[in-house]
Amino acid sequence: MSEIGLVKIYFGKVRDLYEIDDKRMLMVASDRLSAFDVILDDPIPSKGEILTQISNFWFKKLAHIMPNHFTGQTVYDVLPENEAKALEKRAVVAKKLTPVKVEAIVRGYLAGSGWKDYQKTGSVCGIQLPEGMQEAQQLPEVIFTPSTKAAVGDHDENISFEECGRIIGKELAEEVRAKAVRLYTEAAEYAKSRGIIICDTKFEFGLDENGTLTLMDEVLTPDSSRFWPADQYKVGTNPPSFDKQFVRDWLEQSGWNKKAPAPKVPADVIQKTVEKYREALTLLTQD
């Protein structure tokens, strides 16, 4: 990825943040891929550009629900032209916000860690569910299952809503839950009309200088969500998905112990992953 003249203030699993001034920062989506909380050596070509386009699409589409991190400026307003040109498809000029210290996870279907939790306890993150549910089944209602925010290399931990309230305050927890459920519900309805089932997703929120809850980071991408092709969806199975599942499945069967460093991922697995990301972008955004 191109070098730029701004000071880097954060290096994440996928995104890097650069200082613009005390109110704004540049968020750049790389082609890095993380799986099982380990950053892989092999990038996924164009992934950062595809994720940024999907995120920007949703930020605009859902702007009537709540404010987001957009400043209304482009990279050309803050970078020299040659730097801006290299990053225009993968960078966003974002407001500096105080992050809310929980991950806002919303689930509409029973899958992943939720399915494992249900098999053991009959509930997901302390929310009791009906008996006899199957993998990938739609939940009776959308549920909010927050988790703690881990540092790079650590694992997020699922927590109860009560614990979420203790971490960020009851009133803010209520607002985060209400907004996250509404964002998911509207997005899931739209995506379904385009042939994608959004099984679950993770939102990130921040507070602006006035304490207003604001949507930030990335929204409803194949990295932050589980997207299933509607035409291949079947209850009782683990449906294929438009995301890094290809890579995760390959790593699972490779015998890797899920600690850094990760094994080298074959080129055909990387190629299939790029195609899945592109397909999701096309389905969601084409007219």
UniProtKB/Swiss-Prot annotation:
It is an enzyme of class 6 (ligase). Its EC number is 6.3.2.6. GO terms for molecular function: ATP binding; phosphoribosylaminoimidazolesuccinocarboxamide synthase activity. GO terms for biological process: 'de novo' IMP biosynthetic process. It comes from the Bacteria. Belongs to the SAICAR synthetase family. Keywords: ATP-binding, Ligase, Nucleotide-binding, Purine biosynthesis. Pathway: Purine metabolism; IMP biosynthesis via de novo pathway; 5-amino-1-(5-phospho-D-ribosyl)imidazole-4-carboxamide from 5-amino-1-(5-phospho-D-ribosyl)imidazole-4-carboxylate: step 1/2. It catalyses: 5-amino-1-(5-phospho-D-ribosyl)imidazole-4-carboxylate + L-aspartate + ATP = (2S)-2-[5-amino-1-(5-phospho-beta-D-ribosyl)imidazole-4-carboxamido]succinate + ADP + phosphate + 2 H(+). InterPro entries: SAICAR_synt/ADE2_N, SAICAR_synth, SAICAR_synthetase_CS. Pfam families: SAICAR_synt. SUPFAM superfamilies: SAICAR synthase-like. This is Phosphoribosylaminoimidazole-succinocarboxamide synthase.
